Amino acid sequence: MDQIMQFVEPSRQFVKDSIRLVKRCTKPDRKEFQKIAMATAIGFAIMGFIGFFVKLIHIPINNIIVGG
């Protein structure tokens, strides 16, 4: 019986902690959601521009190396 409790107790504690976490979580309000969405959009745009410029720079370099 003691061995069974050794396996059951960590699971029980995990479920208890998970329920407590879900109860404490709150949905963001409209202003907070817009701020997070704007920050994410700006991050995507910056990464896109970086990728575009890296590609733009490496195309001519690749053509010179390959000898096109």
Curated annotation (Swiss-Prot):
InterPro entries: Prot_translocase_SecE_dom_sf (IPR023391), Translocase_Sec61-g (IPR008158), Translocase_SecE/Sec61-g (IPR001901). GO terms for cellular component: endoplasmic reticulum membrane. Residues 62-68 are extracellular. The keyword Transmembrane applies. One of its GO terms (molecular function) is ribosome binding. Pfam families: SecE. Keywords: Endoplasmic reticulum, Membrane, Protein transport, Translocation, Transmembrane, Transmembrane helix, Transport. The chain crosses the membrane at residues 33-61. GO terms for biological process: intracellular protein transport; protein targeting to ER. Its main location: endoplasmic reticulum. Residues 1-32 are cytoplasmic. It is found in: Endoplasmic reticulum membrane. It comes from the Eukaryota. It is a single-pass membrane protein. Component of SEC61 channel-forming translocon complex that mediates transport of signal peptide-containing precursor polypeptides across the endoplasmic reticulum (ER). Forms a ribosome receptor and a gated pore in the ER membrane, both functions required for cotranslational translocation of nascent polypeptides. HAMAP family: SecE. The SEC61 channel-forming translocon complex consists of channel-forming core components SEC61A1, SEC61B and SEC61G and different auxiliary components such as SEC62 and SEC63. The SEC61 channel associates with the multi-pass translocon (MPT) complex. Belongs to the SecE/SEC61-gamma family. This is Protein transport protein Sec61 subunit gamma.
